[in-house]
Curated annotation (Swiss-Prot):
<dbReference type="InterPro" id="IPR020581">
    <property type="entry name" value="GDC_P"/>
</dbReference>
<keyword id="KW-0560">Oxidoreductase</keyword>
<dbReference type="InterPro" id="IPR049316">
    <property type="entry name" value="GDC-P_C"/>
</dbReference>
<dbReference type="GO" id="GO:0005829">
    <property type="term" value="C:cytosol"/>
</dbReference>
<dbReference type="GO" id="GO:0019464">
    <property type="term" value="P:glycine decarboxylation via glycine cleavage system"/>
</dbReference>
<dbReference type="InterPro" id="IPR015421">
    <property type="entry name" value="PyrdxlP-dep_Trfase_major"/>
</dbReference>
<protein>
    <recommendedName>
        <fullName>Glycine dehydrogenase (decarboxylating)</fullName>
        <ecNumber>1.4.4.2</ecNumber>
    </recommendedName>
</protein>
<comment type="similarity">
    <text>Belongs to the GcvP family.</text>
</comment>
<dbReference type="GO" id="GO:0004375">
    <property type="term" value="F:glycine dehydrogenase (decarboxylating) activity"/>
</dbReference>
<dbReference type="InterPro" id="IPR015422">
    <property type="entry name" value="PyrdxlP-dep_Trfase_small"/>
</dbReference>
<dbReference type="GO" id="GO:0005960">
    <property type="term" value="C:glycine cleavage complex"/>
</dbReference>
<comment type="function">
    <text>The glycine cleavage system catalyzes the degradation of glycine. The P protein binds the alpha-amino group of glycine through its pyridoxal phosphate cofactor; CO(2) is released and the remaining methylamine moiety is then transferred to the lipoamide cofactor of the H protein.</text>
</comment>
<dbReference type="InterPro" id="IPR049315">
    <property type="entry name" value="GDC-P_N"/>
</dbReference>
<keyword id="KW-0663">Pyridoxal phosphate</keyword>
<dbReference type="GO" id="GO:0030170">
    <property type="term" value="F:pyridoxal phosphate binding"/>
</dbReference>
<dbReference type="Pfam" id="PF21478">
    <property type="entry name" value="GcvP2_C"/>
</dbReference>
<dbReference type="InterPro" id="IPR003437">
    <property type="entry name" value="GcvP"/>
</dbReference>
Length: 975
């Protein structure tokens, strides 16, 4: 709701308490244009009201007439009320000291990183760095991440994060399938690999015909596998020398993936030095809270020969237009938005913000600090092992880094009971064994408590920590042959910023280079760069959410699970489906899960042969990439001249593949930014031929409260909580991609059987390492919905549509709007056609994108879904003033193009071809251009008081891919 002006309220007598209480409504903070601005935009469009506009935009046949059924969340809460309600849920969680391990560890997030990265909108509101000139800060941070990983693993090249360790291992499996022995379909997993990793691998392997075998690592060379996965150290703590085994696997024609603990690699010989081909793992213990399972940044590193087969994003070094070093995303032709079903992976959003945190943890501590932490962890583990042996227990593993497995026999239940009394969680290995994993937060007092637990179970007295320390001498529990001797993190960036003053200034210097939502609108089509409100972000840092282990006992996570249940029901209401799973930790994973659910449904009906997926030509690249991963055959459906699905072609393809039709994947509103009038007919055609309808939820920001995929024929959708429901993009992640399904598909929602989590009675296997995926950022979406309430969520959708149509209307005289619905109206985004401009002037869409940087804007989405176009999505959060500033910039750029067309400006020496202009270029002694310095840097008057300077000139993409270099740049190169 929009609030009355206080002057009008003050003139009303008497003032009611209810009228005054509405002044804390969150909606007017979230929705950018006020009532007067909205009316001005409606006047421009020729509509009397927002309701009239919506009636004209959305087909009546799919309109949702009832208010969103949000139950207890129908009425909006103030920011304070919502925080208090969420605090009450958080307080139901119990924060125990968790020594469960299994890939997750408590950690200290350095306060300077917490405040200046995780809590800093300059970092968390940025977009994926596809526009490198305005992304140099986070690109440098991600390059640091890659350098950190390659140094610690001993491999040649690393990507800039994946979703979690289990997903990274599954990606490594498919990578090795592409490069491995052609006659084998076997992937061998050692029996001491993390159980959640094995389950995700099995899920990934099944639809693409990979046979996953498990057994002792020693048997791997005889398995005839194209790839072998080893854990280093193993889940039970063993540290094994795999040199001979790796040689044997290679001799048999296989390749080796090692899931390695990065902290352990500061003291253990890295996998790259003993022959591993690929290394994967999690960087969570580098300063990122456990968060009930995520989000955390995984890594994947490879030998040099496999670099073009890597999944995920890769930061590389190039030069700019002036020959200075610049950073960019390299080898993008591997990615799904270009290669589609032939991509190396369907991963789009990764975990950039968490990768940045982990890299800064390494920068802050440096090699000496990291090694000190590792040695202390190992020392405490060794003291614990010595102590329990004194108490009469046997340890299962004599070599270890941080994890000791204890043979507790008949006293196992007692050990857990006594630990529980001290608010300690231990790993339940079996009825006869207990696991204890030490982390950087473990103190000598914690060690004393652990020993007291085992002493109580043994009926003895715990040895003192000091006595154990003195008696153990300098012994370590690491095999002498595996103690690391090679140097790591030698680059200056890891050896300079160790005081808080230096670290603070380094972080500030990086964030100052970038353009994020804290500076200006980011009008990226299909990306929904809306407000990420501070009140939504606050709970992410609460320890009641951050310090919970994903495998903690259920009685300790009551508040988490209640919050998750409530959020699932909120999303059920928004989508019109029957059930939601929050396990997928990215939109790509939600897509993949949805397609696996469709396959499971068909198989349950004896129709497992259905494997054809119809996908419109306009679809986002993740759609065909996900379908391929799910074992489906992609058949492309044509679009007509208006950008809609070609009904005649759809009917023909559905008829042709009727016996094997599994699904259609459509996006609604379409990727062309239009509400297709015949969406119900599309659904009916597919259903008539036995298929299911997958509605991609990427554009859900145009539907909430107005229509719902579950009500117009959809069977399954994924959502992007990092778009519609306010989780920030973080410069390329984290994201959450819930999968929502109709009632007939609910029993197929993903489980995680390895940890006892069961959602669907016939559920598919796990698609993420943790049962609830990236659980610790779910409070963001919970807060957003709770503070908006039903009517304001609908108002937000309507305003997003209003803002998009206002931009389209005002820019139409200057740039053709490529697609529109009845009355020339668009949905929540519009596509501007720049192809005629290229023909008339030689100016490209890339030139316009770079020139927008000089005006202080991130470019709209380039060349998707149509090459040579810009797709603009303003969202509901931008004010009319900001929309007008963007419109004025685009009109001014059109005038600059017109000068080229008319011969008043040179076709090569003009401000567009040389954009962006850095401060160094503009202030240089020599100015070689025909246009003025003022036109280059200050083309509109508003920049005089608010100027953003790109830190580098135009990046040379071709040079970067020809001369691939993906590690930190020596300081001398910047001279």
């Amino acid at each position: 709701m929009k609030l009355e002006h206080p002057d009008r309220l003050m003139n009303r007598t008497p003032l009611s308490l209810a009228a005054l209480e509405t002044h804390d409504a969150f909606a007017e903070r979230h929705i950018g244009p006020d009532a007067a601005s909205q009316q001005a935009m409606l006047d421009t469009l020729g509509f009397a009201s927002r309701a009239a506009l919506i009636d004209a935009v959305i087909p009546a046949s799919i309109r949702r007439n009832e208010t969103l059924p949000l139950g207890p969340f129908s009425q909006p809460k103030s920011e304070a009320e919502a925080l208090a309600a969420l605090r009450a849920l958080a307080d139901k969680n119990q924060v125990f000291r968790s020594y469960i391990g299994q890939g997750y560890y408590d950690t200290h997030t350095p306060a300077v990183i917490l405040r200046n990265v995780l809590e800093n909108p300059a970092w968390y509101t940025a977009y994926t760095p596809y526009q490198p000139e305005i992304s140099q800060g986070r690109l440098e941070a991600l390059l640091n991440f890659q350098q950190m990983v390659t140094d610690l693993t001993g491999l040649a090249i690393s990507n800039a994060s994946l979703l979690d360790e289990a997903t990274a291992a599954a990606e490594a499996m498919t990578l090795l399938q592409r490069v491995g022995k052609p006659k084998s379909n076997v992937f061998y997993v050692a029996d001491d690999v993390l159980p959640q990793t094995l389950e995700v691998i099995r899920t990934r392997a099944l639809p693409i015909g990979i046979d996953v075998k498990t057994g002792p690592a020693a048997d791997a060379a005889q398995s005839n596998a194209f790839g072998v996965l080893l854990q280093y150290p193993g889940v039970n703590g063993d540290v094994r020398d795999y040199r001979a085994l790796t040689d044997a696997i290679h001799a048999a024609g296989g390749h080796v993936v090692v899931a390695a603990d990065l902290l352990a690699l500061t003291v253990l010989t890295p996998p790259g030095e003993w022959g591993a081909d690929v290394a994967v793992g999690n960087t969570q213990r580098f300063g990122v809270p456990m968060g009930f399972g995520g989000p955390h940044a995984a890594y994947l590193a490879v030998r040099d020969e496999f670099k073009r087969q890597m999944p995920g994003r890769l930061v590389g070094v190039t030069v700019d237009a002036q020959g200075k070093p610049a950073l960019r995303l390299a080898l993008q032709t591997r990615e799904q938005h270009i290669r589609r079903e032939k991509a190396t992976s369907n991963v789009c959003t990764a975990q950039a913000l968490l990768a940045i945190m982990a890299s800064m943890y390494a920068v802050y501590h440096g090699p000496h600090g990291l090694k000190t932490i590792a040695l202390r962890v190992n020392r405490i583990a060794a003291l614990f092992a010595a102590g329990v042996k004194q108490l009469g227990f046997a340890t299962v593993n004599d070599t270890f880094f941080d994890t000791v497995t204890v043979d507790t026999g008949a006293r196992t239940a007692q050990v857990h009971a006594f630990a529980n009394a001290k608010r300690i969680n231990l790993r339940r290995v079996s009825d006869a064994r207990v696991g204890v994993s030490i982390d950087e937060t473990t103190t000598r007092d914690d060690l004393a408590d652990l020993l007291a637990v085992f002493a109580q179970a043994a009926g003895g007295t715990a040895p003192s920590v000091d006595a154990l320390d003195a008696g153990l001498g300098g012994e370590a529990a690491l095999p002498a042959s595996l103690v690391r001797t090679s140097a790591y993190l030698t680059h200056h960036v890891f050896n300079r910023h160790h005081s808080e003053t230096e670290m603070l200034r380094y972080l500030r210097s990086l964030s100052d280079k970038d353009l994020a939502l804290d500076r200006s609108m980011i009008p990226l089509g299909s990306c929904t760069m809306k407000l990420n409100a501070t009140s939504e972000m606050l709970p992410v840092t609460w320890p009641e959410f951050g310090r919970i282990h994903p495998f903690a006992p259920a009685e300790q996570t009551v508040g988490y699970r209640e919050m998750i249940d409530q959020l699932e029901q909120m999303l059920v209401a928004a989508t019109g489906y029957a059930a939601v799973s929050l396990q997928p930790n990215a939109g790509s994973q939600g897509e993949y899960a949805g397609l696996l659910i469709i396959h499971a449904y068909h198989a349950s009906r004896g129709e497992g042969h259905r494997d054809v997926c119809l996908i419109p030509a306009s679809a986002h690249g993740t759609n065909p990439a996900s379908a391929h991963m799910a074992g489906m055959k992609v058949v492309v459906v044509a679009c007509d001249a208006q950008g809609n699905v070609d009904i005649a072609d759809l009917k023909a393809k559905a008829e042709q593949h009727s016996a094997n039709l599994a699904a259609i994947m459509i996006t609604y509103p379409s990727t062309h930014g239009v509400f297709e009038q015949n969406v119900r007919e599309i659904c009916e055609i597919v259903h008539a031929h036995g298929g299911q309808v997958y509605v991609d939820g990427a554009n859900m920001n145009a539907m909430v409260g107005l229509t719902a995929p579950g009500q117009f024929g959809g069977d399954v959708s994924h959502l992007n909580l990092h778009k519609t429901f306010c989780i920030p993009h973080g410069g390329g992640g984290p994201g959450v991609g819930p999968v929502a399904v109709g009632a007939h598909l609910a029993k197929f929602l993903p489980n995680q059987r390895s940890t006892g989590y069961t959602r669907g009675e016939d559920g598919i296997g796990a698609v993420s390492a943790a049962p609830y995926g990236s659980a610790s950022i779910l409070p963001i979406s919970w807060m957003y919905i709770a503070m908006m309430g039903a009517k304001n969520l609908t108002a937000a959708t309507e305003t997003a549509i209003l803002n998009a149509n206002y931009i389209a209307k005002r820019l139409a005289p200057h740039y053709p709007v490529l697609y529109s619905g009845p009355g020339g109206l668009v949905a929540h985004e519009c596509i501007l056609d720049l192809r005629p401009i290229k023909e008339s002037s030689g100016i490209t869409v890339d030139d316009v994108a770079k020139r927008l940087m000089d005006y202080g804007f991130h470019a709209p989405t380039m060349s998707f879904p149509v090459p040579g176009t810009l797709m603009v999505e303003p969202t509901e959060s931008e004010s009319k003033e900001e929309l007008d500033r963007f419109i004025d910039a685009m009109i001014a750029i059109r005038d600059e193009i017109r000068a080229v067309e008319e011969g008043r400006a040179d076709r090569e020496d003009n401000p567009l071809r040389h954009a962006p202009h850095t401060a160094a270029v503009v202030t240089a002694n020599e100015w070689p251009h025909a246009y003025s310095r003022e036109q280059a840097a200050y083309p509109v008057a508003s920049l005089g008081t608010n100027k953003y300077w790109p830190p580098v000139g135009r990046a040379d993409n071709a040079y970067g891919d020809r001369n691939l270099f993906c590690a930190c740049v020596p300081m001398s190169d910047y001279a």
